[in-house]
Amino acid sequence: MKFTLFSVLVVLLIATFVAADDCPRICTADFRPVCGTPSGGRRSANRTFGNQCSLDSHNCLNKGDTYDKLHDGECK
């Protein structure tokens, strides 16, 4: 009984930490490129992301290095 209760508490604790991170980590492999431009006036080159999900994931995981969608397709 104690082991079962302990196991349930561990699972709930893990689920809480996983739920706190809402960043998409797994994106589909479909190649629908989008061109991103650095947010906030940073002076760096535009960057091509494999798809919108990849751009969103990058922005979520890298708060100080975000990109705005410039247009569909690869950056020129």
Curated annotation (Swiss-Prot):
Protein name: Vasotab-TY1
UniProt key word RNA-binding: no
GO molecular function, one term: toxin activity
One GO CC annotation: extracellular region
Record-linked Gene3D superfamilies: 3.30.60.30
Residues of the signal peptide: 1-21
InterPro entries hit by this protein: Kazal_dom (IPR002350), Kazal_dom_sf (IPR036058)
Compartment list: Secreted
Domain of life (superkingdom): Eukaryota
SS bond list: 23-60, 27-53, 35-75
Origin organism lineage: Eukaryota, Metazoa, Ecdysozoa, Arthropoda, Hexapoda
GO BP term, pick one: vasodilation
Key word Secreted present: yes
Chain ranges of the Kazal-like domain: 22-76
Purpose: Vasodilator protein that inhibits vasoconstriction of isolated rat femoral artery induced by phenylephrine. Since platelet aggregation and vasoconstriction are key hemostatic responses, particularly in small wounds, this protein likely participates in the antihemostatic responses during blood feeding. Blocks L-type calcium channels (Cav1/CACNA1) in left ventricular myocytes isolated from rat hearts.
Keywords, alphabetical: Calcium channel impairing toxin, Disulfide bond, Ion channel impairing toxin, Secreted, Signal, Toxin, Vasoactive, Vasodilator, Voltage-gated calcium channel impairing toxin
Pfam families: Kazal_1
Tissue distribution: Expressed by the salivary gland.
